[in-house]
C-alpha cells in the first residue's frame, strides 16, 4: 500500500501579511507613477526651440522605478507557502510564491538520512556545528514545532529545518522509515 501525505504550510498571522501585501501594491503604483512622470520629464524643449536634458528627472525615474520593482519583489514574498509531500519514504519540499510560482527546493529519501529530530536537540546542534553544512530553514511560523533532517546529496551536506503537522510527524518518525541511530527522539506509531 502506498503512503502519500501532503502538507501546505501557510502563515498563522495571515491578516497582517495580507495588509502588508496591499500596502506594498499601493506604494508600488505610486512609485511607478512618480517614476514614469520622471521619465516623461527627462527631455524637454527650451524656449529657443532646442532640446534639453534634466539629470534630476532621470535620477528620480531610476530611483522610483527601482523602488517599484523592489516593492513588487517584496510583495511576492509576503504570500509564500511551503509544500511538503511524503511518498513511500521520499520527502519533497517546494516553495509556492503568490499562489502561482512553484519552486522545487529539495527531495530526499528518508532512509538516506544521517540524523533527524526536533530543532534545538543535541543532535541538531552537533549537525549544525559541522563545517561545510548548508542550513536551509524552510518554514514560516517561528513559534511552530520544527524538525530537522540531516543528509548528504551530491557531495554536499544539508541540514533542512521544517515545520511539520502531527500527521506528517507520525508518518515520518516511525520505525518503518527511520532507523534508531538516525532518529533523535521517541518513535511515533501510525
Q: Whereabouts are the PLM-identified features?
A:
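Transmembrane alpha-helices and immediately adjacent membrane-cytoplasm interface residues
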Residues: 54-80
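Structured surface patches comprising rigid loops and adjacent beta-strands/short helices at the edges
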Residues: 106-126
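A membrane-cytosol interface segment of integral membrane proteins
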Residues: 126-185
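Long, low-complexity intrinsically disordered regions enriched in Ser/Thr, Asp/Glu, Pro/Gly
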Residues: 186-190
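Hydrophobic core of alpha-helical transmembrane segments in multi-pass integral membrane proteins
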Residues: 25-36, 62-70
